[in-house]
Amino acid sequence: MILLAAKGLSLLDVNPGLVVWTLITFLVVVLVLKKFAWDVILKALDERAQAVQNDIEKASELRLEAEALLKDYEARLNSAKDEANAIVAEARSDALKLKNKLLEETNQEVKAQKDQAVKEIELAKGKALEQLQTQFVEMTITIAGKVLEKQLKAEDYKAFIETELNKLGKLSA
C-alpha cells in the first residue's frame, strides 16, 4: 500500500487487464469445482440435510413416546393411589368391625360375669338367711327352755319354729 501510494496508485483504481484475468481465473476455478467437486459438495449437503431431518423426526417420535409413557405412568400412579385408598378404607372398615365385635364380646362377658355374681350373691344371701334362721331357732329354743325351765325335745320345737318362720316368710314375700 505504501508502495502503491508512492507510485501514485490507489487501491480503488481499476486496472482493466487485472479485472479480465481475475474473471477468467474465477471462471476456471468455478468450472474445475463444478467438474470435480460440485456433485460431491451437493451430495454432502443433501446428506447433511437428510440427517438433520431424520434427527428431527426421531426426536419428535421420542417426544411422543415419552408423552405416552408419562401418561401411562400417571395412569398407573393414579391406579396405585386408588388401590392404596381402597386398602386403607378396607382396613378401617375391618378395624371398626373388629372393635365392634370386641366391644360386643366384652359386653357379653361383663353381663355373664354380672349375672354370675348376682347368682352367687343370691346363693350367699340364701345361705346366710338359712344360717340366720337356724341360729334364730336355736336361740329361741334355748331362751324358751330357760324361760320354761323345762327342756323340750329340741327337734320338735325346732320344727315348730321353722314352720312358723316359713309362714312369716311367705306373708312378707
Curated annotation (Swiss-Prot):
Similarity remark: Belongs to the ATPase B chain family.
One Pfam family here: ATP-synt_B
Transmembrane intervals: 12-32
Domain of life the protein comes from: Bacteria
Its biological purpose: F(1)F(0) ATP synthase produces ATP from ADP in the presence of a proton or sodium gradient. F-type ATPases consist of two structural domains, F(1) containing the extramembraneous catalytic core and F(0) containing the membrane proton channel, linked together by a central stalk and a peripheral stalk. During catalysis, ATP synthesis in the catalytic domain of F(1) is coupled via a rotary mechanism of the central stalk subunits to proton translocation. Component of the F(0) channel, it forms part of the peripheral stalk, linking F(1) to F(0).
Bilayer disposition of the protein: Single-pass membrane protein
Quaternary structure and partners: F-type ATPases have 2 components, F(1) - the catalytic core - and F(0) - the membrane proton channel. F(1) has five subunits: alpha(3), beta(3), gamma(1), delta(1), epsilon(1). F(0) has three main subunits: a(1), b(2) and c(10-14). The alpha and beta chains form an alternating ring which encloses part of the gamma chain. F(1) is attached to F(0) by a central stalk formed by the gamma and epsilon chains, while a peripheral stalk is formed by the delta and b chains.
Record lineage: Bacteria, Pseudomonadati, Spirochaetota, Spirochaetia, Leptospirales
GO cellular component: a single term: proton-transporting ATP synthase complex
InterPro entries found in the cross-reference section: ATP_synth_b/b'su_bac/chlpt (IPR002146), ATP_synth_F0_bsu_bac (IPR005864), ATP_synthase_B_chain (IPR050059)
Compartments where located: Cell inner membrane
Name of the protein this chain belongs to: ATP synthase subunit b
HAMAP family (UniProt xref): ATP_synth_b_bprime (MF_01398)
Species the sequence originates in: Leptospira borgpetersenii serovar Hardjo-bovis (strain JB197)
A molecular function (GO) term: proton-transporting ATPase activity, rotational mechanism
Keywords, alphabetical: ATP synthesis, Cell inner membrane, Cell membrane, CF(0), Hydrogen ion transport, Ion transport, Membrane, Transmembrane, Transmembrane helix, Transport
Major location (coarse): membrane
